[in-house]
């Protein structure tokens, strides 16, 4: 219950910080909201007793979790120099951005942990369970960034989405995919193992 309260408080403070200080990072609010939804799906899967709702929440988590990886690309669009950060307005923008990064990474990991715990998977099989999720999210994120393909295309136009997958597979960067996977795996190993 503590995680539920603290994570929602963390989300509210992060969203208000980004909104109030007008942090100008591409798609930061969208990534932040996708992380909130991913975390909510994790909580629903964990606290629900109905297997159908748990399964729907798991599918929702698999939809929103790859969007959280966009925070790693937002680092590219930083506009602060070292001397500019220490000006009062820039410092608060930078701190709001750091708060958003911390929330997005921690909510992504916590949502995966909640998903694993929702299905009562023993500790020795947890890593084997999250590896396919991490591979899927890295693949989906790289596939989306290699072309004009978005995950929302599944809902809007399914046939065009699968044709777009074939087109984007030629441009897929497997080095980026493996790096994103390793970053997620290392963060899981460092932060989530008890």
Listing of model-derived features with the role each one plays in the protein:
Residues 25-43, 54-59:
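Loop-to-helix transition at the N-terminal end of transmembrane alpha-helices
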Residues 33-44, 98-113, 175-192:
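Hydrophobic cores of alpha-helical transmembrane segments in multi-pass inner/ER membrane proteins
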